[in-house]
Curated annotation (Swiss-Prot):
InterPro entries: Ribosomal_uS8, Ribosomal_uS8_sf. One of its GO terms (biological process) is translation. The keyword Acyltransferase does not apply. The lineage of its organism: Bacteria, Bacillati, Actinomycetota, Actinomycetes, Frankiales. NCBIfam families: PRK00136.1. This is Small ribosomal subunit protein uS8. The keyword rRNA-binding applies. The gene is rpsH. Belongs to the universal ribosomal protein uS8 family. Part of the 30S ribosomal subunit. Contacts proteins S5 and S12.
């Protein structure tokens, strides 16, 4: 069975692992998931990520995301929300980019310049598809 929304699957895996205080999340690899993980690392929501080649007998590479917690196991990710979905795409112009919690969170936007945060897209004056909010 094919996956309808791999981005929502990734965000759900990260959200669930974060709520269960897991140290890492394993998921199927794709380029867009790698770019989302890169943005999450740049913004300080995760410790890091890496891609592993398939084990013998396994199909496809896996993306492993290392989650980040505070000194007393406080979660660095308070919430994640998928905005643009396969059934309802959401786009934003460069003049109308969303702010997540007044700038405390980050919006991940797919632009012609690649995946960018709302701040990066605003500086470059490009709009695009609003994939998700993270706070």
């Amino acid at each position: 069975m094919t996956m309808t929304d791999p981005i929502a699957d990734m965000l759900t895996r990260v959200r669930n692992a974060n709520r269960a205080y897991h140290d890492r999340v394993v998921m199927p690899h794709s380029k867009i998931k790698t770019h989302i993980a890169e943005i999450l690392q740049q913004e300080g929501y995760i410790l890091g990520w890496h891609v592993e080649d398939p084990a013998e007998g396994a199909v496809g590479r896996t993306l492993i995301v290392d989650l980040k917690y505070g000194p007393n196991r406080e979660r660095s990710i308070a919430g994640v929300k998928r905005i643009s979905k396969p059934g309802l795409r959401v786009y934003a112009k460069s003049t109308n980019l969303p702010k997540v919690l007044g700038g405390l969170g980050v919006a991940i936007i797919s632009t012609s310049s690649g995946l960018l945060t709302d701040r990066q897209a605003g500086k470059r004056r490009v709009g695009g598809e609003v994939l998700a909010y993270v706070w």
